[in-house]
Amino acid sequence: WSAANRSLKFRSARLSPLMTKVLVSDPIDQAGIDILTQVAQVDQKVGLSIDQLKNIISDYDGLMIRSGTQVTSDVISEAKNLRIIGRAGVGVDNVDVPAATRKGVLVVNSPGGNTIAAAEHALAMILALSRNIPQAHASMFAGGWDRKKYVGNELYKKVLGVVGLGKIGSHVAKVANAMGMEVIGFDPFVSIERAQQMQVRLSDLEELFKQSDYVTLHLPRTPETENLVDIDLLRKMKPTARLVNCARGGIIDENDLANALEANVIKGAAIDVYAKEPLTENSPLRSVSQGLILTPHLGASTVEAQQNVAIDVAEQIRDVLLGLPARSAVNIPGLSAEIMDSLKPHLKLAETLGLLVSQISGGQIQKLEVRLQGEFAQHPSQPLVIATLKGLLTSALGDKINYVNASLEAKGR
């Protein structure tokens, strides 16, 4: 329903590819490009700087990116025609989502497209740490044959701590259980019942770090999680423990991790994501002499995952440009196409009622209360509330207000 206001404009008319333009600014699988060309002129311009993107973004109705493109508030402020930003992947920390919301630009991602790839990379890191595979490989190519030096550890009956039990973390837990590991988890949004279904014992964060032989991180980068894993938390780990991060950069304090490895505070770590990417040449991680495996953000880099996320996000961009709902909207509640179809006339009515209220109110409106009765009460309430807000604010903001930014604009008044 996120594009309901646009569907009212376009009705069932088809968009001409000559009228609509989509910019693809990161490498995207051809399957996704083929979908976009059904409804738009597609320009592929990879490696743009922020200034270059600012200079051209006003020409486009849609933007499709991966992790490389930085969609800052300055870029969004220049996006006069932009309706949707599609992130071919999960994390949207390279998009200023609040700025997009204020501008009325829908942001979508693909939360399930690279689940298997990311989970398998984390598991591969755990196995590589356990059996010293990178070090043994390098030794062989240097002419060595040292079996004693690279004696490893079995994962069977070891304790795996999973921080974040979303789609990726829960899949890691599933495979780890199958390998005979004991899995404990930390996730404040997961119930005891759900954890039991996953065969995961819930723990607080500090206890998880104390008890685990391996800790794997699967959580987003937010102000609350930035540098979450610092020297204090690392010191709570066993000296034989290993740490894996294939989630988002910036969750681990990289200086603290480098120091902890050099001082034998923990046995090892495997890192795929970094606070700043590409990883700088003078990063302290590049100077660690023992126990560290580094990969260049390969978590979602499989043929299958690249294709999955490209198709998923391209379909969402196509649908939104045609006035249909998006499956995985980040900055607005998502609804199925079936519910959207049933809601369309009610959304229009709610919008009209909001406009009527704005015209008959005698002064500044301090509070808006929406009550649903009868047939209305059978539908999800939030879309109807937002439609009412859109109508209410239209008289003051005109075309600047839409279903994406209506709630945010109302809260700011």
Regions flagged by a language model, labelled:
Residues 168:
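Hydrophobic/small residue at the entry helix of a nucleotide-binding pocket
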Residues 69-76, 188-285:
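Rossmann-like adenosine-cofactor binding region
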Residues 107-108, 231, 240-360:
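Rossmann-like dinucleotide-binding domain for NAD(H)/NADP(H)
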Residues 103, 111-159, 163, 171-178, ...:
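Phosphate-binding beta-alpha-beta segment of Rossmann-like dinucleotide-binding domains, i.e.
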Residues 45-46, 66, 88-89, 105-116, ...:
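Short beta->alpha connector loops at strand-helix junctions that form conserved
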Residues 328-412:
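An accessory alpha-helical subdomain
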